[in-house]
From Swiss-Prot:
The gene is WRKY47. Its main location: nucleus. GO terms for cellular component: nucleus. Transcription factor. Interacts specifically with the W box (5'-(T)TGAC[CT]-3'), a frequently occurring elicitor-responsive cis-acting element. It comes from the Eukaryota. GO terms for molecular function: DNA-binding transcription factor activity; sequence-specific DNA binding. This is Probable WRKY transcription factor 47. Residues 144-153, 163-172, 182-215 have a biased composition (Basic and acidic residues). It comes from Arabidopsis thaliana (Mouse-ear cress).
Amino acid sequence: MEEHIQDRREIAFLHSGEFLHGDSDSKDHQPNESPVERHHESSIKEVDFFAAKSQPFDLGHVRTTTIVGSSGFNDGLGLVNSCHGTSSNDGDDKTKTQISRLKLELERLHEENHKLKHLLDEVSESYNDLQRRVLLARQTQVEGLHHKQHEDVPQAGSSQALENRRPKDMNHETPATTLKRRSPDDVDGRDMHRGSPKTPRIDQNKSTNHEEQQNPHDQLPYRKARVSVRARSDATTVNDGCQWRKYGQKMAKGNPCPRAYYRCTMAVGCPVRKQVQRCAEDTTILTTTYEGNHNHPLPPSATAMAATTSAAAAMLLSGSSSSNLHQTLSSPSATSSSSFYHNFPYTSTIATLSASAPFPTITLDLTNPPRPLQPPPQFLSQYGPAAFLPNANQIRSMNNNNQQLLIPNLFGPQAPPREMVDSVRAAIAMDPNFTAALAAAISNIIGGGNNDNNNNTDINDNKVDAKSGGSSNGDSPQLPQSCTTFSTN
């Protein structure tokens, strides 16, 4: 029996932990060990992996930590290194801290960018406001200068003043024209500005329109007025002292002679143009039509023609009559500055206004014979008719020499032109009764004014009649027609 017991071997059940720890630990976890096992070390050991009461396996150097996230449940396994004693969550915390710092920095940059954007908008608005104010100030300054120039320019008293005034009027714009040509952006910008004087500008336009209604002749532009000059000339053009360049010609209806077009080349951008064409009825007559005003200084040889055309255009646009125009053109200022009028000692221009032309046109005809020289009315009223007639001594000198007639200086110390003297000589040579008629007129005037010197007057008259072979009558004689008109043609 004992032998049978000794040969019997028992099977011992071990837990998984006891199997891994070996025999040294198995003694502590086997409290109900049989006495047979104490004597017999060779026993079969089995591992029970399905034990009901299994204890947690402890490796000794590894422990489990639970990580609870923000969601409330365990979302990770945190392993702690036994050597360093640090957890993997520390790196995640550092990353999250850096991310939150970056978010704060980004928010700060966004806020700063928003402030800078707002500041830029304010600066842009201030700049636009300042620019509108500068434009308004410039416009006001230009309008003030233009108004001042209109006040400083004298009235059309002389042809030279008119000549200097026309280019300014053509180059400068009126305030109404400037406001019409203003761009829509400028108008909108000035209306948006709360400080812009919108109402005064409208009142200024109304006042300008009122002035234009009061002066309808001022609305006509000087550039559109044309002055035609008819003169006899065999040359291609009339020498008016300016330099011209021909830029074209064309045939006109009803005239076999072509019409040539010229522009002034004395200065760059000079707006003056002229058209030259011969008359169809008389080819010796050359018609020159001027348009525009010179914007540059003129030589002395060109001043007379420019002054004449400017005066004619001014009279045309101002609505003056042809008689006033004739007086203006007959003034010494328009005829004494150039040799162009030396062939015309007395201006006998016939001014003709043309209403059928597309532009206001005035024609100055220089082909007619000159009119007789008539002294101004103030000289006649002050000195009387006897002051302009020669005395008896001058008549004797004329009869003795039979060469020249001593004509007193009526209009100043200047001597009469040579052409006039030649014309007088020719008239005296053609009419032998001139001296007799002139002596009779003088005797009648002197005899009626001085009763005390009747005898001397009769003696002088008899001497004159004896020398001239004429007779004096009681009636006042009339001067022959050939003596009252001087022709230089």
